[in-house]
């Protein structure tokens, strides 16, 4: 089965309705396989709501961190790369629900550009490994001829972003965190991550 994208524009007649239902119904007998349905307002900016961007601009925050909180300890950054419609949805291991992976590195970097703010990226030091972290740095900051830089270019971004702010993990001292470990163990893990990331 080959999935296809079908963009549709429609107008909601009554904007005051609180409990509306959106349905996709075939006109003939048969079977529909729907990967996902995404609804965005017409005035969205690269997938972000214009009103939310306006509010964020008003904050004038100098730095934005992503991915945030406990979520990062189970997040695989590879899942947020490539065409949005082909990204795998994943069960969110830190919280309930499903992560659609609509926002990955490229979208986060675009958000920072739109807000004129510095990106700050957290790497997965919970269930993630050293190589994944170093590869993520290379994907963001590596030259076009590096393995990750080539992949970044294939995904539409030739020039490296030169991300300056990075962190290793999130609250690894807490037993609520995926991959929780003792302070002594995390110091060793942190340093091995940092060494590999600095070498990129």
Task: Give residue spans per PLM region.
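Non-catalytic accessory regions flanking glycosidase/transglycosidase catalytic cores in CAZymes
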Residues: 1-200
